[in-house]
Design a protein with these regions (language model features):
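Extended, highly charged
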Residues: 1-168
């Protein structure tokens, strides 16, 4: 059972969520070089298809990523960090499992207006590549998207993206 309360968590972004996973012992950090095309997902699938009980599953944070062409990435990849098991999901939703349905219904029925921030004050900005710039490795291949089924998928795909939002 996750031991922090909603008031204690109060984290504002994915970095803080990762810190909470680490503090709760729900994160396995892989710092050795991992090939995103051949090694990343088989390692993660091992825990789901290898007979590990759900409560013993962990999130994986890969920090030293390469691909089959030798390209190195400076972006870490978190896999299973939002819903690897019920404890991880509960931690991210910031509510008890028994309250998940009510929490989702409340969030869907009570959307909040976006908080518009002046571009100069924004903590992050879009980086947009168009036209010929996409041919120089700045398209989807600039992001270390793993290949889900090595040997079967011919490229990385965004098949089930997650969105990080904040519920006031």
């Amino acid at each position: 059972m996750v031991e922090t309360t909603l008031e204690e968590r109060g984290y504002t972004d994915l970095h803080e969520h990762i810190e909470e996973l680490r503090a709760q012992g729900l994160l396995i950090e892989i710092d050795r070089e991992i090939n995103k095309d051949t090694e990343m997902h088989p390692l993660v699938r091992w825990q789901f298809r290898g007979g590990i009980d759900e409560e013993d599953r962990k999130a994986f944070l890969f920090t030293n990523i390469t691909d089959s062409k030798g390209r190195k990435y400076d972006i870490p990849v978190l896999v299973g960090g939002l819903a690897g098991n019920q404890q991880i999901y509960q931690l991210g939703m910031r509510c008890d499992l028994k309250d998940l349905k009510t929490t989702w219904i409340n969030a869907i029925n009570n959307p909040i207006e976006p908080n518009v921030v002046d571009s100069a004050d924004a903590p992050c900005h879009d980086v947009v590549f168009e036209g010929e710039d996409l041919l120089n490795g700045n398209g989807l291949d600039a992001i270390p998207v793993p290949i889900s089924s090595p040997g079967w998928d011919n490229a990385p795909y965004f098949s089930s993206s997650h969105f990080i939002t904040k519920d006031p």
